[in-house]
From Swiss-Prot:
Lineage of the organism: Eukaryota, Metazoa, Chordata, Craniata, Vertebrata
Binding site for Mg(2+): D250, E276, E305
InterPro entries the record matches: Enolase-like_C_sf, Enolase-like_N, Enolase_C-like, L-fuconate_dehydratase, Mandelate_racemase_C, Mandelate_racemase_N_dom, RHMD-like
Family, per entry: Belongs to the mandelate racemase/muconate lactonizing enzyme family. ENOSF1 subfamily.
Its job: Plays a role in the catabolism of L-fucose, a sugar that is part of the carbohydrates that are attached to cellular glycoproteins. Catalyzes the dehydration of L-fuconate to 2-keto-3-deoxy-L-fuconate by the abstraction of the 2-proton to generate an enediolate intermediate that is stabilized by the magnesium ion. May down-regulate thymidylate synthase activity, possibly already at the RNA level, by promoting the degradation of TYMS mRNA via an antisense RNA-based mechanism.
A GO MF term: isomerase activity
Protein name: Mitochondrial enolase superfamily member 1
Length: 445
């Protein structure tokens, strides 16, 4: 029995000054401060367990998401956890379909980021109650229960509830072997940490060299600011990693459609597997055009980290606008909405390669991609999960990478709990770190 009624919801603006060292920098986001709207929910249960959740931001604007979380809290406080998880679809719709709040969405923007933070905390608490890591909670669920967590509204022309159920039932075959394979070998990862756009050549060379020694074979390179510089950097990195290792490119929405096609063709000689976010994340038809034009040079299109909701993913898939689908554990409406996208990707036979470039994203998305392999896709072909080597030390249960692979978490929960001292030090603007930076005028407020 899942005990406890939610009695309070705490929300904190937590920011890390990553812009000072250009960590996370790309063609569009030149000075990001990796940040989170961090949620903690408490119940009246005797076990004292708490649910921890977050959504990822880049600094300024986190306060907007914090306000949105507070606006959603009235749908959460006073609810029994058992009632939520036994009617999860209804609870999800309560959060996303508030008759007034949905006007500033619906299911997109700051209000959807806030929804993810709240629901991530609920899922974390549920998994802790069941004494399982989140991925194992999902793997052990009956297909009917999994389907009951999903809101199929607006996507039944691409995936019906019956089709989703059949996919999950078929996924039971070989499930135990796949789970054992993950426990032994882990889920393949690629690194983005070597080639942020703001890094010097010396940094690139050292980081690539270190990564190769650690066993990394898949590398992502940020591009899009200057073509000549991109050519130089791609040549440097291709020379460093050799002809047999995999390179991907990421433009972070920098180009118009025709510009993207021309620019990427000029980089084709470096044999990138994909170009990520070549244009506006909302331009589905633009992505489709780019996909068609780059197909002859064997470069796929990857996108999804700023895809607002399952409806957009539906359209990307229907339009054949992406070859690699990148879910995000905090952009979509938490586990619930990600489940629907994983199932659509399976139906359309498109590999899922999650986005994880942000604080806490590696910790969260590892659970989703493990579930995808074990219960949905059943395949590792053309599949990998992003890894960035930043800020894991601030989490109670940090991600574990071994031989360039995500090793399945064993601790109960969604791996979302941050260390209390980190929250105190980095809360904005009153944490000790930020007070010092503001006093020294190293940052603008």
């Amino acid at each position: 029995m899942i005990t406890g009624k939610i009695t309070c919801l705490h929300i904190t603006d937590v920011r890390f000054p990553t812009s000072l060292d250009q960590h996370g920098s790309d063609a569009m986001h030149t000075d990001p401060d990796y940040s989170a709207a961090y949620v903690v929910i408490e119940t009246d249960a005797a076990d004292g367990l708490k649910g921890h959740g977050l959504t990822f931001t880049l600094g300024k604007g986190t306060e907007v998401v914090v306000c949105a979380v507070r606006a959603l809290s009235r749908h959460v406080i006073g609810k029994a956890l058992e009632d939520i998880v036994n009617n999860f679809r209804d609870f999800y719709r309560q959060l996303t379909s508030d008759g007034q709040l949905r006007w500033i969405g619906p299911e997109k923007g700051a209000v959807q980021l806030a929804t993810a933070a709240v629901l991530n905390a609920v899922w974390d608490l549920w998994a802790k109650k069941e004494k399982k890591p989140l991925w194992k909670l999902l793997v052990d669920m009956d297909p009917h229960q999994l389907v009951s967590c999903i809101d199929f509204r607006y996507i039944t022309d691409a995936l019906t509830e019956e089709e989703a159920l059949k996919i999950l039932q078929n996924g039971k075959q070989g499930q135990r072997d796949r789970e054992e394979h993950m426990l032994t070998s882990g889920y393949p990862a690629y690194t983005t940490s070597c080639a942020w756009l703001g890094y010097s050549d010396e940094q690139l060379k050292k980081l690539c060299s270190d990564a190769l020694k650690e066993g990394w074979t898949r590398f992502k390179v940020k591009v899009g600011a200057d073509l000549k510089d991109d050519i130089r950097r791609c040549e440097l990195i291709r020379d460093m990693i050799g002809p047999d290792n995999i390179m991907m490119l990421d433009a972070n929405q920098r180009w118009d459609v025709q510009e993207a096609i021309s620019w990427v063709k000029d980089l084709a000689k470096y044999k990138p597997l994909w170009i990520e976010e070549p244009t506006s994340p909302d331009d589905i038809l633009g992505h489709a055009t780019i996909s068609k034009e780059l197909s002859p040079v064997n470069i796929g299109v990857a996108t999804g980290e700023q895809c607002h909701n399952r409806v957009m993913f539906k359209q990307f898939l229907q339009a054949k606008a992406l070859q690699y689908l990148q879910i995000d554990s905090c952009r979509l409406g938490s586990v619930n909405e990600n489940l629907s996208v994983l199932l659509m990707a399976k139906k359309f036979n498109v590999p899922v390669c999650p986005h994880a470039g942000g604080v806490g994203l590696c910790e969260l998305v590892q659970h989703l991609i493990l579930f995808d392999y074990i219960c949905v896709s059943g395949s590792l072909d053309n599949r990998m999960c992003e890894y960035v080597d930043h800020l894991h030390e601030h989490f109670t249960y940090p991600v574990i990478i071994n031989r360039a692979a995500y090793m399945p978490p064993k601790d109960p929960g969604y791996s979302t709990e941050m260390k209390e001292e980190s929250v105190l030090q980095y809360q904005f603007p009153d944490g000790a770190v930020w007070k010092k930076l503001i006093l020294e005028k190293k940052v603008e407020v």
